């Protein structure tokens, strides 16, 4: 469905995009070992690309998890 948040990545950030406002959204970045590199609770406005900075992360593969209540999206991305 179109209301699910979508994830995009460039060299400096991972972006959360949603067509509807997402309140009390928890965004976390962890590595494969479970170490937490980023954690925040925020609101993503409708039709906005919300940037989560990744430029300072060490090279490797990470999980980006997004939770809102019982709904969640987990994505994987790599930093070179």
PLM regions: where:
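Residue-level structural signal for beta-strand termini and adjacent loop
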Residues: 42-43, 78
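Non-cytosolic beta-sheet module surface loops
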Residues: 17-20, 31, 54-56, 68
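Short beta-strand segments
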Residues: 38-40, 50, 73-75
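Short, surface-exposed loop/turn motifs with a glycine/proline- and acidic-biased composition
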Residues: 43-68
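Glycine-centered coil/turn sites that cap beta-strands in beta-rich domains
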Residues: 1-26
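Short, glycine-anchored, charge-dense loop/turn motifs used at functional sites
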Residues: 30-37, 62
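Short acidic/polar mixed-charge low-complexity motifs
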Residues: 23, 35, 71-73
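C-terminal tail/sorting-segment detector
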Residues: 1, 63-80
């Amino acid at each position: 469905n179109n209301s699910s948040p979508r994830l995009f990545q460039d060299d400096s950030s991972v972006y959360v995009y949603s067509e509807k406002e997402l309140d009390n959204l928890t965004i976390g970045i962890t590595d494969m070992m479970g170490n937490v590199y980023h954690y925040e609770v925020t609101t993503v406005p409708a039709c906005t690309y919300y940037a989560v900075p990744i430029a300072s992360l060490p090279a490797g593969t990470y999980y980006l998890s997004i939770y809102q209540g019982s709904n969640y999206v987990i994505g994987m991305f790599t930093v070179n």
